[in-house]
């Protein structure tokens, strides 16, 4: 029983950064912007969060720094793609490469240094309930943030007028502009929110998941978050389910290696990425699934005077 509970705990921990980053990207894509820089923003959030936490001794300051760094990196993306109308795909890829390189340079002095960790929110009495106690009432703070964030985004997109406006921009920015909606303003806010979420996800990696700095510690999670949005057909609750499925795959390969299963470790390590590719291939083969809820203006630049 203890082994099962521990496995479920590690799955929740592995799923949390995927969920936070994917929910942020979902809001960005609902506005019609395709941000392929999630991986770069996540790794910059990781190094920023670890650095601030290490220098101040406070994981909470580290967490705030991770959010700010991710938001600033996304602001750069927004200026380039929204104000300067650069290609969103090329810009996102460039920022990912920049983030990976810059984080490696900044993090050189942090390699091998002891980190600070966000404490778990152990609720006295409740966390001693068999099985569910540790799973529900003994998690790290960002576990609860990720669940609350999913519920909040779901409510915002489908229960508020502002959310409806954001979705209308993603479906047809020209029509929204004709109605007097400030398309660029909405997209700026959506992109910054997505970047802040990516930074927060990176902060989880360096302050909770592995409280130390390791170069390229995001390990492709930003790309998996992007795939999760497509897998979920741009629906928040499906992102939640998908994050835990991919989290289980991620943890499954680690436990398989620990238990000495006679399969090459390189193959086991590639399982999360293979699962991502398989899911995207299956979805792309089904035209109905591909078009379901896809924002019609996704990836298209908007320049009012054209």
Where are these regions (language model features)?
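Helix-loop-helix "hairpin" substructures at the membrane interface of multi-pass membrane proteins
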Residues: 135-213, 236-241
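Short, non-helical or kinked segments that cap or interrupt transmembrane helices
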Residues: 27-45, 82-95, 165, 189, ...
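Transmembrane helix-bundle core of multi-pass membrane transporters
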Residues: 100-159, 259-268, 292-306
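Cytosolic-side transmembrane-helix boundaries in multi-pass membrane proteins
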Residues: 153, 171-178, 182-185, 256-306
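Inter-helical junctions in multi-pass inner-membrane proteins, predominant
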Residues: 3-8, 157, 194-227, 262-263
């Amino acid at each position: 029983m203890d082994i099962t509970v521990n496995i479920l705990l590690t799955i929740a921990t592995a799923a949390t950064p995927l969920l936070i980053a994917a929910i942020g990207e979902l809001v960005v894509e609902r506005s019609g912007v395709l941000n392929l820089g999630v991986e770069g923003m996540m790794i910059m959030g990781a190094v920023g969060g670890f650095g601030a936490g290490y220098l101040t001794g406070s994981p909470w300051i580290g967490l705030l720094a991770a959010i700010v760094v991710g938001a600033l990196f996304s602001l750069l993306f927004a200026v380039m793609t929204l104000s300067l109308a650069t290609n969103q795909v090329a810009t996102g890829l460039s920022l990912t490469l920049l983030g990976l390189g810059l984080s490696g340079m900044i993090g050189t002095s942090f390699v091998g240094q002891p980190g600070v960790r966000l404490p778990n929110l152990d609720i006295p009495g409740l966390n001693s309930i068999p099985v569910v106690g540790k799973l529900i009432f003994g998690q790290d703070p960002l576990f609860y943030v990720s669940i609350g964030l999913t519920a909040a985004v779901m409510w915002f997109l489908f229960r508020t007028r502002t959310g409806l406006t954001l979705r209308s921009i993603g479906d047809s920015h020209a029509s929204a502009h004709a109605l007097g909606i400030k398309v660029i303003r909405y997209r700026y806010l959506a992109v910054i929110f997505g970047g802040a979420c990516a930074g927060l996800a990176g902060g989880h990696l360096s302050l909770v998941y592995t409280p130390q700095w390791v170069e390229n510690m995001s390990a492709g999670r930003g790309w998996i978050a992007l795939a999760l949005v497509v897998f979920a057909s741009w629906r928040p609750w499906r992102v939640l389910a998908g994050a835990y499925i991919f989290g289980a795959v991620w943890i499954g390969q680690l436990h398989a290696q620990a238990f000495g299963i006679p399969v090459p470790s390189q193959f086991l390590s590639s399982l999360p990425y293979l699962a991502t590719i398989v899911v995207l291939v299956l979805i792309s083969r089904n035209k109905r699934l591909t078009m379901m809820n896809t924002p019609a203006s996704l990836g298209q630049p908007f320049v009012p005077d054209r």
